[in-house]
């Protein structure tokens, strides 16, 4: 049964059965992004409905969050590239089928660890000013605390469930892991494979899962889809550190190319 408290639910008909795909996460306290200024952004969709964010890392691969597959069931998984508005016609927009969906082998439904997903598009994306891959961090280093990083998405933008049609974004300062692991914050659960950003009324959340945390023009992290209270300063946003997964990402894409 669809949740009527304000969170968007996309009903997916599977024969006689009805499943619910909910958009994972939201941008709280942000603003509309400049049109097509983030040409790497992807909308991961099930039966034409946005459920997660993602970003283009090569002509044929999109990186997202493993938990996003929980919303797929037997629905049709696709990726929308070149979009600013989800509903309005735009010359750069194109919807791609997914040839392969590869979650990290150690990802689990009950944990945010290893929350990564690689999606191979059915064909190479048509690159242009509004569609471009994003560089991602390959060197194992820590982003200094206080660094302002950009996060964007199409998730709902308020606790009342209002959902934007156009891409939203905000800047968030990175929070050091020691502070993020304090008992009053995430109580030791943040590993070296994760990073945190402050979340005082400005936050990414489950609905923007899979989108990139971009610092200095490079994707340093991916929005996780773990359940938590969004916009609560005592529960900072958690992101999967890409530098910890270079071998896995390269390996998946190389194996697929060789197949």
Curated annotation (Swiss-Prot):
UniProt-listed InterPro entries: Peptidase_S1_PA (IPR009003), Peptidase_S1_PA_chymotrypsin (IPR043504), Peptidase_S1A (IPR001314), Trypsin_dom (IPR001254), TRYPSIN_HIS (IPR018114), TRYPSIN_SER (IPR033116)
UniProt EC number: 3.4.21.46
UniProt GO BP: complement activation, alternative pathway; protein maturation; proteolysis; response to bacterium
Statement: the UniProt record of this protein carries the keyword Hydrolase: yes
Keywords attached to this entry: Complement alternate pathway, Disulfide bond, Hydrolase, Immunity, Innate immunity, Protease, Secreted, Serine protease, Signal, Zymogen
Activity regulation, free text: Circulates in plasma in a mature but self-inhibited form. Activated by factor B (CFB), which displaces the self-inhibition loop. Associates with CFB complexed with complement C3b.
Prodomain positions: 22-26
Free-text comment on this protein's domains from its UniProt entry: The self-inhibition loop inihibits the serine protease activity in absence of factor B (CFB) substrate.
Name of the protein: Complement factor D
Annotated source species: Sus scrofa
């Amino acid at each position: 049964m669809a949740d009527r408290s304000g969170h968007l639910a996309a009903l997916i008909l599977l024969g006689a059965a009805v499943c619910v795909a909910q958009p994972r996460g939201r941008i709280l306290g942000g603003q509309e992004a400049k049109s097509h200024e983030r040409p790497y952004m992807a909308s991961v969709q099930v039966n034409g409905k946005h459920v997660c964010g993602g970003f283009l890392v090569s002509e044929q691969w999109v990186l997202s969050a493993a938990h996003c597959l929980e919303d797929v069931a037997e629905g049709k998984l696709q990726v929308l590239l070149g979009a600013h508005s989800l509903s309005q016609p735009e010359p750069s927009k194109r919807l791609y089928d997914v040839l392969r969906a590869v979650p990290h082998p150690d990802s689990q439904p009950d944990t945010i660890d290893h929350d990564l997903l690689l999606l191979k598009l059915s064909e190479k994306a048509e690159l242009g000013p509004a569609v471009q891959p994003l560089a991602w961090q390959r060197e194992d280093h820590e982003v200094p605390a206080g660094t302002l990083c950009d996060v964007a998405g199409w998730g709902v933008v308020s606790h009342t469930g209002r959902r934007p049609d156009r891409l939203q974004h905000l800047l968030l300062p990175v929070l050091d892991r020691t502070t993020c692991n304090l008992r009053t914050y995430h109580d030791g659960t943040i590993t070296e494979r994760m990073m945190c950003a402050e979340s005082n009324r400005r936050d990414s959340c489950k609905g923007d899962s899979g989108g990139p945390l971009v610092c200095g023009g490079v994707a340093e992290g991916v929005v996780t889809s773990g359940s938590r209270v969004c916009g609560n300063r005592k529960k900072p946003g958690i992101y999967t550190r890409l530098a910890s997964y270079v071998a896995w990402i390269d390996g998946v894409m190389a194996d697929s190319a060789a197949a």
